[in-house]
């Protein structure tokens, strides 16, 4: 059970050292380090509300599902003194998995923000999902972080979702530290994991620790920088991991360990010298005769420079479940990952000391309404103050400011740059919005940017880059139990959409039904469950359907004339346009261009009305009414009489577009998923046979320890209920992950089958 964070007994964050060398030989020193408070003490964040920005670390934990992210987070909270008991995913009593569905399923769905202190540092930590249906949660967490910890299962190496998340981190140029978890598993392999990081992530692993023992005999680590041995005594049942012994390596230690450390440290020094010129000069200048004599502090500084430059990734190891190796990981976070002022954000410098923050998540609280997570990039945020939302052009009053501790919060008066906060009272703000102190502040930032670039007045935005929202791939209808509950359902869906932008809700124009669009079966299932649990509405879901797309096969030109009298006004507009298929990439977004003379002739408001008409037509393709992709529209002529409204222009353009799309011939595009299945060799043939019946294309079959890794491309429509089938085929001894690969044209036979199915003929 989570206890109050405001316990009156306050202690410093630094662990204390107890000398245990009384019975040791004089030349040998043994230390026992305790990294937590007494069992009945819980620390309070009120000790330091606004730490120095150099002491802040905004960190994300990311990995494949079941690699141990949440367990690692729980150990961090325990050893730093913010929880009394060790939370366990299997027991359903973790701090960061606070939604009922998360505790039942043992997976992380929403990115829970946790703030805690480690030694002299403030760590704002985000625990992100490892399931592909919740990729947006990872994306929006990474958008506001300065560093990341990638957690790997040491017996599996780099897995499918790890590669997806790693690509997201690379896009945001986030320095990373790798943690090889589950070193206690019999199949755990340090060498395999390092090779996997090199081969699959194209990263440069910088090994900082080697394990002592393997499998069940894994008892400790050796730090290659300091040459110190860390040993945890007993097992997870008898030792919570708070105390462990640190010994300097001695000649009397195991010769195999000494040899392994000597070779690994020499390799580390050589690798860092190759990656960091300053360190290479230091070695050749002062330590040319004996590289191994380089001081640990100099080596650590070089590793930090390599990490911040993203030339290499420090690799540590341990077992979070067995309470081993987490404290050194916390030390590595503070030692190697950047402070907020070490990350470059171009736009932020134009605000100088004024407030600039990004809203990266919204959750709903029944008593307090919407709670908005914000990352403060510059200036400070104060409770009971007004702030301006640049994206919505709205000024709102923020009533309260909170520090997040999973599902608990501490109220604070203000918070400075570099921190992550939770705000109450921002009712219009959604994910990706930029928050500043005032309209005047935003205008001043734009002026500074223009002066620096000596560019035109409209070439700069005062808004930070938002969060990219992926397109949904599944949809289904949702109905309330009675019409009396329709308004309640609409309110629930509005709240859930603000929390989760990857959830789309639309009204079917033909049936009038409410339609949910999501990222996968599990995503839709979780939304359905939340409506029942949190809003007490028993809804009915229709059959799950695939979100297809459409494109065109050839170019076509169409003309249209609209001549209509509304009231006493006559509206006349004529349009001519041509649509072309974008052959090089049928999955590309659509494009709109005007011929030069047309663009020069039309006023800006008419051009906007034309673009709205084209965009409206792109929403419904000519074959099945799915959204259109891979089409370029060229506007060749637009003529209208004075008094013609913008709405009539849009209507005429949309009607003309529909003609052109039909003439061009439609093609259905289906989502194709990249599938990775991990299965024992004894079940491989049955899995392959099943995939061949699902129109799957086998890309590769790899080996990982005793398992086979099957990589395939499979149409999403064929993957409905695959988890149940795979469990049956392999007696539960297989795992799989899916990721959207591309939209591909369906062959004529499959398209006809789909057309008949949609028409209700099959």
From Swiss-Prot:
One Pfam entry name: EFG_IV
Sequence positions that bind GTP: 63-70, 127-131, 181-184
MF GO annotations: GTP binding; GTPase activity
UniProt cross-references to Gene3D superfamilies, sorted A to Z: 3.30.230.10, 3.30.70.240, Elongation Factor G (Translational Gtpase), domain 3, P-loop containing nucleotide triphosphate hydrolases, Translation factors
Record's keyword annotation contains Cell cycle: no
Residues that span the membrane, as ranges: none
Cell location: Mitochondrion
InterPro entries for the chain: EFG2, EFG_II, EFG_III, EFG_III/V, EFG_V, EFG_V-like, EFTu-like_2, G_TR_CS
Transit peptide: 1-35
Known EC number: 3.6.5.-
All copies of domain tr-type G, residue ranges: 54-341
Keyword Cytoplasm on entry: no
Reactions accelerated catalytically: GTP + H2O = GDP + phosphate + H(+)
Family per record: Belongs to the TRAFAC class translation factor GTPase superfamily. Classic translation factor GTPase family. EF-G/EF-2 subfamily.
Full protein name: Ribosome-releasing factor 2, mitochondrial
